[in-house]
């Protein structure tokens, strides 16, 4: 069975990501990217900027270690959500595929105000953005919905939104990515996770009440 609303969100997000991808293939450096990047870099982000070095640091193998730690946490505290966690982390496969298919040059100081990071891979999409959005969302879906009281869920999702926004802005501020790289990455993540949630067999297991988990455990024993 399929959750129609989540599938519709997945289709819309995927279509938007495809549109941005087509745009940058036809015009790798659209003027809107340069304008937005310069505006972001000229802005004083205050306390949000304190986390920028952390978002830069989390790349490479350190991200894989965090993925493993999150998966272990899901196995311990919400075993029924392990399929959701594994499927969710497949956003990394989308990054690998698209970064090999689309070789986009990264921002340079000839066009933007600063470039403080110099990754060698394709600028499109933003692997950091996909990673941050995926991990934050999966933590909320797999553990937040299990243990947080209902009144606190909006607060939890607001925290996720702030973290994802801050991480996205950091990739533009450092000059590591163009704004369209970051926007497409958010849409790719939203499309994939929404698609997974649309599959009831996966989402029902992840959001099953604790009592149902104990019943399954007794049956298994």
Named regions from a protein language model:
Residues 1-64, 101-121, 220:
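N-terminal transmembrane-helix/juxtamembrane module of multi-pass inner/ER membrane proteins
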Residues 4-13, 67-94:
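Interfacial segments of alpha-helical transmembrane regions
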Residues 18-20, 90-97, 161-172:
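Aromatic-anchored segments of alpha-helical transmembrane domains
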Residues 47-48, 77-82, 149-155:
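Membrane-helix interface segments
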Residues 93-101, 125-130:
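Mid-bilayer segments of alpha-helical transmembrane spans in multi-pass integral membrane proteins
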Residues 112-221:
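Membrane-embedded catalytic cores of phosphoryl/pyrophosphoryl-handling enzymes
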């Amino acid at each position: 069975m399929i959750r129609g609303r989540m599938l519709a969100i997945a289709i819309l997000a995927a279509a938007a990501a495809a549109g941005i991808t087509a745009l940058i293939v036809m015009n790798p450096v659209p003027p809107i990217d340069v304008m937005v990047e310069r505006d972001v870099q000229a802005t004083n982000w205050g306390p949000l900027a304190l986390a920028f070095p952390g978002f830069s640091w989390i790349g490479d193998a350190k991200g894989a270690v965090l993925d493993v730690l999150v998966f272990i946490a899901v196995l311990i505290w919400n075993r029924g959500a392990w399929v959701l966690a594994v499927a969710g982390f497949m956003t990394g496969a989308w990054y690998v595929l698209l970064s090999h298919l689309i070789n986009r040059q990264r921002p340079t100081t000839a066009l933007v105000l600063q470039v403080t990071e110099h990754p060698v891979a394709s600028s499109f999409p933003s692997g950091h953005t996909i990673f941050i959005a995926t991990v934050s969302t999966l933590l909320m879906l797999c553990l937040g919905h299990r243990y947080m009281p209902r009144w606190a869920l909006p607060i939890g999702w607001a925290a996720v939104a702030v973290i994802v926004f801050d991480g996205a802005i950091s990739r533009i501020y450092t000059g590591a990515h163009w704004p369209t790289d970051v926007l497409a990455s958010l849409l790719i993540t939203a499309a994939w996770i929404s698609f997974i949630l649309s599959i009831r067999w996966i989402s029902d297991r992840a959001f099953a009440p604790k009592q149902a988990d104990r019943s399954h455990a007794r049956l298994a024993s």
